[in-house]
Amino acid sequence: MGILDFFRKKEKKENLWTKCEECKNILLAQELETNFYVCPKCGHHHQMNPYLWASMLLDYNYNVLFEYILPTDFLSFKDTKRYKDRLKTLKETSNTSEAMTVFDGKLSDYPVVLSVMDFSFIGGSMGSVVGERFKLASLKAVQDKKPHISVVTSGGARMQESVISLMQMAKTSIAVDIMHKNGIPFITVLTNPTTGGVSASFAFLGDVIIAEPKAIIGFAGARVIEQTIKQQLPEDFQTSEFLLKKGMVDMVVHRHLMKQTLKNLLNLLFYKNA
């Protein structure tokens, strides 16, 4: 090995080990992945990328849709980093092209459109691409007469796109209304965290709203609310279980039971007489 080889950038090796965010136990990364990112020690549900969600929920031979719709730096926005540079870095390092990936496939032989958000892509924030992909996914569900399932995780609207990102709240809500008017079931699966403009738009417009255990779900953060109302909030405030007790979600379902639960709902809502 020469001196230049010594200084040359080495390929990044995958980490063999990881740590549970909840119980702090050290786990084999491969073990966590094969368990669909549910901690085998404490049952904590970690974030999972869209392609793993698709492999867990869908049968083989599904298609990925609308990948040609890509983000644009409309405003030449810069915070700690230029938005254009942030997108370029994500293009090189992320396994998704945006914070939402849309799949067309079958869930236990039932045709569905599946849209899945990715928190690792700028906090799962909703910008113009997320709004447009969700709209097109909903219209495809209407056109093909099959249910739309959306797995949601988000920090809210994408600040780098300013008012354009806020417009997506209206766009996605209208898309859900079109599905409702055409009798197409829309099911949302809320994962940790689901907050901000996404929770204030399509996330809570599902015909059935499912949440994963102990997910943080809400609009503003608990600390912001406490500072505003000057009151102490309940310890389990904004958790899936708290929202279930208050009637804001319909059921709390473990990730390993999600496919069977969705199959039962699809049979009940749409495919019973198929």
Swiss-Prot record:
Gene3D superfamilies referenced in this protein's UniProt entry, alphabetically: 2-enoyl-CoA Hydratase, Chain A, domain 1
Protein name: Acetyl-coenzyme A carboxylase carboxyl transferase subunit beta
Originating species: Hydrogenobaculum sp. (strain Y04AAS1)
GO CC annotations, alphabetized: acetyl-CoA carboxylase complex
InterPro entries recorded: AcCoA_carboxyl_beta, Acetyl_CoA_COase_Trfase_b_su, ClpP/crotonase-like_dom_sf, COA_CT_N, Znf-ACC
Function field: Component of the acetyl coenzyme A carboxylase (ACC) complex. Biotin carboxylase (BC) catalyzes the carboxylation of biotin on its carrier protein (BCCP) and then the CO(2) group is transferred by the transcarboxylase to acetyl-CoA to form malonyl-CoA.
Start-end of C4-type zinc fingers: 20-42
Keywords on record: ATP-binding, Cytoplasm, Fatty acid biosynthesis, Fatty acid metabolism, Lipid biosynthesis, Lipid metabolism, Metal-binding, Nucleotide-binding, Transferase, Zinc, Zinc-finger
EC primary class: transferase
Names of required cofactors: Zn(2+)
One biological process term in Gene Ontology: fatty acid biosynthetic process
Amino acids binding Zn(2+): 20, 23, 39, 42
Reactions performed catalytically: N(6)-carboxybiotinyl-L-lysyl-[protein] + acetyl-CoA = N(6)-biotinyl-L-lysyl-[protein] + malonyl-CoA
Pathway(s) served: Lipid metabolism; malonyl-CoA biosynthesis; malonyl-CoA from acetyl-CoA: step 1/1
Localization: Cytoplasm
Subunit comment: Acetyl-CoA carboxylase is a heterohexamer composed of biotin carboxyl carrier protein (AccB), biotin carboxylase (AccC) and two subunits each of ACCase subunit alpha (AccA) and ACCase subunit beta (AccD).
